[in-house]
């Protein structure tokens, strides 16, 4: 039987030496508690009270090992609109589901999430909305989805 050691993160620092890296999605970086596996296969658990993780944070484990946080690309939908009313209604509906969104001129970018699957389906059916599913770095607007 093989056992793997789970490292507990005890501190989050900046600009210190590190020996491993972990890639996290935007969503995972917002979680106060998470488990992850580093590039070298180390299992770790993070309990980041009163904050969330940022790219280039160094997670300091109980044994002093430093693990650098890197962003992974997210599965996203890009929705491009030809009119202001459809744009506003769609943004309202997504916001009403408490989902973060990235707003640009006549464009909304959202994470692929089951809670808005029906909205995305409706967007595909609407000829005035161009829908594209892709992988990219998600950068939501505002601070509505920060740690409270």
Curated annotation (Swiss-Prot):
GO terms for biological process: protein folding; protein-containing complex assembly; urea metabolic process. Pfam families: UreE_C. GO terms for cellular component: cytoplasm. The keyword Cytoplasm applies. It is found in: Cytoplasm. Keywords: Chaperone, Cytoplasm, Nickel. SUPFAM superfamilies: Urease metallochaperone UreE, C-terminal domain, Urease metallochaperone UreE, N-terminal domain. One of its GO terms (molecular function) is unfolded protein binding. Involved in urease metallocenter assembly. Binds nickel. Probably functions as a nickel donor during metallocenter assembly. Belongs to the UreE family. This is Urease accessory protein UreE. The lineage of its organism: Bacteria, Pseudomonadati, Campylobacterota, Epsilonproteobacteria, Campylobacterales. The gene is ureE.
